[in-house]
Amino acid sequence: LEVTLGHVRAAAAAGADLILTPELTNGLSSSRDRQRALFRREEEDATLAALSVEAKIGGRWLLIGSLGLLTDEPDGRFANRSFLIAPDGGIAARYDKIHMFDVSVSETEIYRESEGYRPGARAVLATTPFARIGMTICYDLRFPALYRRLAQAGAEILTVPAAFNHITGAAHWEVLLRARAIETGCFVLAPAQTGFHPEHRGKGRRTHGHSLAVAPWGEVLADGGTEPGVTLVNLDLSEVGKARRRIPSLGHDREFD
């Protein structure tokens, strides 16, 4: 939490109007026991409370990429929930990750996110004074229909906080983000976890890093690299309209068999 607060304060001091953090800001772990020890209900979560106060102090919009939260699920599964915090410290929007990362990247890297987290069921478009924001999380990135629906509903910015695996990240992260930006004519902002996240006995997982900002025409505007820190980028929202006028594909859907 202290590291996150330091980065948020640095971004605010640099003049950021919208600040974003990665997926599972309050703790990235594959251990169910550690998750149960770390996670709290939304109303009791210390990270949510502290970052909401920080947004209010700085008068900034803050997207908490996501938090792992306890739920009332009978099977004990958690929520993976993104929050958009307004400058008054209030929660402007919530989004629960829809698509669960149930994959076998290799013989030694197997993930079954749905065993620990319940999937969301609702797309979320948030309205702010500067833009309409479509909220997504990590593995959602591989499902373009979600992004198309958000763009057709009016999204100008799409957020993709993530903890992308280092193998899939190296192969697919930038290409997928650029594709979603090009397909929708939206800015795509993707704050990402980076580095090695240790578990017990020296085991753990490695995330890809490379927080990216992508323009509606597909250009990468900023790349945060693999070191923890703050990446700043200026967005000209008129570029959304320009890209969509050049390629108005959001209005060209056709039914087919």
Could you tell me what each predicted segment is?
Residues 90-93, 219-221, 241-242:
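Short helix-loop capping/hinge motifs at secondary-structure junctions, enriched
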Residues 240-257:
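A conserved C-terminal secondary-structure "cap"
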